């Protein structure tokens, strides 16, 4: 029996925000923590990465920003605020407030043992398992989450919009697997 209380481990949080103004590509290119190349994506974006960031922030000339690679919502939002601060301090954008929004939380769960996905996939409504195409079983969650379940007992949860939704989805996944005979 799989323990439904097994906590998921967050591996990536994607969040976005908008500066609600255009960003100066020339000034952004001069920033030491920014990677900007006009040849990449037609010069429409640059990347801000500082030593304190777990991931990086993509900054579009339109002012939209995407934070990827953080392992918590707080860190992801912090990356967006830090990127905004660097843009303002270097004159690439005017001072403004941002309102970060979580778009996706990706986490892993380890069941601690093998899961017989070949046997239980037929007992799980909506499960997709085709070992010739992909070695894992794909499931849709109750909320916006999707699951990948591998025979090794490793699982991936993607699509959560909050830590609470992630915990509910993890509990739901493990309960459904138990009910199917895992």
From Swiss-Prot:
Family: Belongs to the TBP family.
Gene3D superfamilies named among the record's database cross-references: TATA-Binding Protein (3.30.310.10)
Entry's Gene Ontology molecular function annotations: DNA binding; DNA-binding transcription factor activity
Record carries keyword Protein transport: no
BP GO annotations: DNA-templated transcription initiation
Matching PANTHER family: TATA-BOX BINDING PROTEIN
Tree of life domain: Archaea
Ranges occupied by Sequence repeats: 10-87, 102-177
Keywords annotated in UniProt: DNA-binding, Repeat, Transcription, Transcription regulation
General function of this protein: General factor that plays a role in the activation of archaeal genes transcribed by RNA polymerase. Binds specifically to the TATA box promoter element which lies close to the position of transcription initiation.
InterPro entries reported in the protein's UniProt record: TBP, TBP_archaea, TBP_dom_sf
Name under which the protein is recorded: TATA-box-binding protein
Keyword field contains Protease: no
């Amino acid at each position: 029996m799989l323990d439904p209380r097994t906590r998921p481990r967050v591996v990536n949080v994607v969040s976005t925000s908008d500066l609600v103004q255009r960003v100066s590509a020339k000034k952004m290119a001069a920033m030491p923590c920014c990677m900007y190349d006009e040849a990449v994506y037609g010069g429409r974006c640059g990347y801000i990465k500082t030593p304190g960031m777990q991931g990086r922030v993509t900054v579009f000339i339109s002012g939209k920003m995407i934070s990827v690679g953080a392992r918590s919502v707080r860190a992801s939002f912090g990356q967006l605020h830090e990127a905004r601060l660097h843009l303002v301090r270097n004159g690439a954008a005017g001072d403004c407030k941002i309102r970060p929004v979580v778009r996706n939380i990706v986490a892993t769960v380890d069941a601690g043992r093998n899961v017989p996905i070949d046997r239980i996939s037929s007992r799980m409504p909506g499960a997709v398992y085709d070992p010739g195409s992909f070695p894992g079983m794909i499931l849709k969650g109750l909320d916006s989450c999707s699951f990948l379940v591998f025979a090794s007992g490793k699982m991936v949860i993607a699509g959560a919009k909050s830590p609470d939704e992630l915990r509910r989805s993890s509990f739901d996944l493990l309960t459904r697997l138990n009910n199917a005979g895992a």
